[in-house]
């Protein structure tokens, strides 16, 4: 199959089975760059100079559903984290209201499917980091009522009740309150997202959950040994759980040679006063200056396909998906430059012999199914369980984690 033929097949497949992407940081990029002023950054226009995402490129990429991250910095704690998360939610709702012919809010699997049938991109929300609930199950429920349909248990730092993959162990997984968070998420129908969490947290969550979990943007640790990726024993546990691991495109998570380069680049950014996750024009300019002096190892669509090949082998075709992390990273793989690029990845997988039925599961069906399954579990649990009023002090004590 020629590259051109594969790309044509990929586009045709995505017209029938569009991508549901697990993680896009457009709301935070809009906060950082224009203070949520959508007049200053109109995504109905070409925003390629500033963003990975705009409406035309979402359409070109065959995106039918997007989990918009309502991420806030881990430095935000308590009330500040909660209010900033609500501001992020408000941004997603404002985008849907401003572009109703393109974006449609979706809170359920049925609403996701209905949005696609109406020719719109289903817009769902995921909160990225347990700091967004400020150790409060009532706040967790409030975020659910506002439309949040997954919670990533941690971001890059630990929370008092769960360990992150990129922080020093403190709880050795989940505390008793962390288990209660997972169980209350199950009762609500909010997906438990295990991207960013430590392997012991992954394993504790899989033991605690009554519903399928997701990894909204994580790849294979066996292919690239970065702590943000998923160990094989956890991937192998997904069929029994029913969960879905959504492979990410972040170069330092998919290409071993990019790990050390990224560490050095982040150190240079820190010296100049930038946060490692800063994607403002000033931070990007500093990064590009470093890249000019120290050439960057370049991932490609084939690099990501290597991860998906391995994840399919270990977890099975019913338990994988895609979570690009666009607008949350400074660099993307060659050929996966922005949200218009999903056809390039699908074309690469077609050339490797993936069937159209398998690709339809990867792009669309697995994500719809995991959301629908979580909703079914919640309906059953709500017949017998009341909202939890447990507190972290009651379950973990005044001295913190177990």
Kindly give the residue locations of the regions a language model identified.
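N-terminal hydrophobic targeting/anchoring segments and the immediately downstream early-domain regions
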Residues: 1-172, 225-402
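Histidine-centered catalytic micro-motifs
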Residues: 19-26, 197, 215-219
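Distinct, well-ordered alpha-helical segments
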Residues: 136-140, 201-211
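Helix-rich catalytic cores of soluble enzyme domains
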Residues: 144-152, 179-182, 191-194, 199
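Short, contiguous, pocket-lining structural segments
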Residues: 170-177, 193-201, 230
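Alpha-helix-loop-beta-strand connector modules within alpha/beta enzyme cores
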Residues: 171-187, 205-215, 345-348
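Substrate-binding cleft of carbohydrate-active enzyme catalytic domains
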Residues: 183-194, 201, 234-239, 310
């Amino acid at each position: 199959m020629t590259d051109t033929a594969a790309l044509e097949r990929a586009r045709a497949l995505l017209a029938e089975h569009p991508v549901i992407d697990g993680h896009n940081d457009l709301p935070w990029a809009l906060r950082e760059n224009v203070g949520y002023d959508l007049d200053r950054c109109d995504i109905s226009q070409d925003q390629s100079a500033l963003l990975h995402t705009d409406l035309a490129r979402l359409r070109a990429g065959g995106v039918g559903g997007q989990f918009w991250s309502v991420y806030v910095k881990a430095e935000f704690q308590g009330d500040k984290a909660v209010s900033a998360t609500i501001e992020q939610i408000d941004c997603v709702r404002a985008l849907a209201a401003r572009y109703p012919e393109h974006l449609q809010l979706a809170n359920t699997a049925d609403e996701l499917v209905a949005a696609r049938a109406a020719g719109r991109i289903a817009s769902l929300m995921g909160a990225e980091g347990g700091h967004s609930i400020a150790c409060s199950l009532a706040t967790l429920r409030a975020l659910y009522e506002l439309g949040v349909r997954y919670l990533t248990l941690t971001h890059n730092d630990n929370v008092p009740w769960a360990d992150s993959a990129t922080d020093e162990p403190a709880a050795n997984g989940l505390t008793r309150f962390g288990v209660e968070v997972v169980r209350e998420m199950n009762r609500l129908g909010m997906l438990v997202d295990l991207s960013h969490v430590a392997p012991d947290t992954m394993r504790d969550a899989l033991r605690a959950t009554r519903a399928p979990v997701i990894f909204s943007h994580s790849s294979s640790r066996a292919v690239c040994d970065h702590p943000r990726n998923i160990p094989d024993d956890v991937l192998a546990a997904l069929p029994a759980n029913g969960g879905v691991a959504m492979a990410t495109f972040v170069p330092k998570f998919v290409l071993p040679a990019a790990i050390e380069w990224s560490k050095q680049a982040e150190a240079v950014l820190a010296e100049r006063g930038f946060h490692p996750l800063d994607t403002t024009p000033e931070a990007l300019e500093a990064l590009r200056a470093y890249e000019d002096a120290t050439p960057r190892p370049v991932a490609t669509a084939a690099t990501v396909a290597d991860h998906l090949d391995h994840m399919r082998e270990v977890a099975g075709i019913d338990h994988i998906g895609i979570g690009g992390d666009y607008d949350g990273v400074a660099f993307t793989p060659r050929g996966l430059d922005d949200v218009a690029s999903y056809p390039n990845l699908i074309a690469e997988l077609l050339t490797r012999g993936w069937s159209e039925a398998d690709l339809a599961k990867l792009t669309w069906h697995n994500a719809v199914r995991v959301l629908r399954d979580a909703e079914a579990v919640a309906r059953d649990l709500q017949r017998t369980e009341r909202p939890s009023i447990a507190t972290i002090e009651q379950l973990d004590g005044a001295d913190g984690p177990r």
